[in-house]
Amino acid sequence: DIKIVLIPAETYLDVAGGFGKWKIESVYSLGELENPPQGIKFLSDSLSQFLGVPIDGYLKLDRTLKNKNATQLINYLRQNKINFLKLKFSSSSNLNDWELYRLMVGIDSVRFDKIEEVNLEDEYLQDSILPDQTKAKLADPERIEILSGKLFADATINKEQLSIAIFNATQTPGKAQKAARLISNLGGNVIFEKNAQTQNLKNSMVLTNSSAKSYTFNRLQMLFAKNCQNCDIVDEVVQKSRAQINVVLGEDFK
């Protein structure tokens, strides 16, 4: 399936990193003011926070393609495989050649009736007034949460329904709740979240007592523990957990 979410340019969202509310159309430019420029990171992190789902990859289109909306771009790519080559050489991306190939095959194989488009302006945004009296379109958090769970749930994670516990092993509050939202919207079965005994963990890790690594375990490891895939922790609170998968968050999880 292909899910397309249209977010009006005038939508205000909280920019990741504590920069306050900005129009989504301005978030990339805000990030580009950093040294070094971080426009893509600002935008992807802010969208991930807004929708409550992980964002694994991006394509930044050049001016020859950026005037196409998402539906037009997909139709353009499906018309001719050569157009995928044009996309590769006329965009910047964090996807490698193999991932771009898989994207091409995936887009080309999806039936037209399996492409779903949702415009947030229809029923997910509210007209509001910011403290400085600026008129703004703000998201309805409850509706966005329901939408994200519906659109972005991973069918395999949802089917496995393994119990997942989340531990915050840092002194920064709120990390476990943020991770729980991401995992739940992917269809994960989060049974609890709490602070670990350890409070200075650098790299996050994902642990399981099972010798057979499940799809859910591998997906969460790629999401949270790219820097620590064979790590372990001596922590009394974590070791008492009866969850099938334990996600232990370190300082690298922002």
Where is each model-derived feature located?
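Non-catalytic, solvent-exposed segments at the cell envelope interface
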Residues: D1-K254
